[in-house]
């Protein structure tokens, strides 16, 4: 894909219950082609339009999106922090994506379930994104899926590495070229 940076994106279907990932769950669109329709009631579609603006919401028409996935919860929409005071305070490995009004894209990945990092809460993710000026932001899949790769090398420590040295197969990702 010739990317310099990437983070995991949507959740995955785990029909056998073994947590290996690999099959996307929910809406998936890549380079203008819809690969899967939306499935989850109340989940948000998170994606970029042709002008690289991050869109987050429950859309029936996704024709304006170039790339997108489906997950929840939205953290910030139109500058409003939706998770402040929500009680979503359990600490886990987390991944989030956001965008400032000037177009700057933000990617947040926090390790968890490890001695060097217990994780972070959804509320804290919202606070961090807000503190960096996110106008739109959403959670992506977390837990053992949370990973950031820079120049082909993992720069975070996914919890799956303790269970499987090859890590978890991810169904999709947001990439920076």
Report the location of each language-model feature:
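Gly/Ser/Thr/Pro-rich low-complexity, intrinsically disordered segments
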Residues: 1-177
């Amino acid at each position: 894909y010739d990317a310099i940076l990437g983070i995991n994106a949507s959740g995955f279907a785990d029909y056998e219950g073994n947590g290996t990932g690999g099959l996307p769950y929910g809406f998936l669109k890549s380079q203008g082609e819809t690969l899967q329709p939306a499935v989850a009631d109340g989940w948000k579609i998170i994606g970029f339009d042709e002008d690289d603006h991050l869109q987050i919401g429950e859309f029936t028409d996704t024709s304006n999106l170039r790339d997108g996935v489906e997950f929840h919860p939205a953290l910030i929409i139109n500058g409003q922090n939706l998770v402040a005071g929500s009680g979503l305070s359990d600490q886990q490995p987390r991944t989030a994506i956001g965008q400032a009004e000037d177009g700057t894209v933000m990617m947040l990945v926090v390790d968890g379930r490890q001695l060097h990092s217990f994780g972070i809460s959804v509320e804290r993710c919202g606070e961090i994104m807000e503190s960096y000026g996110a106008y739109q932001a959403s959670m992506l899949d977390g837990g053992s899926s949370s990973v950031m790769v820079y120049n082909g090398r993992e720069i975070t420590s996914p919890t799956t590495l303790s269970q499987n040295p090859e890590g978890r197969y991810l169904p999709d990702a947001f990439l920076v070229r």
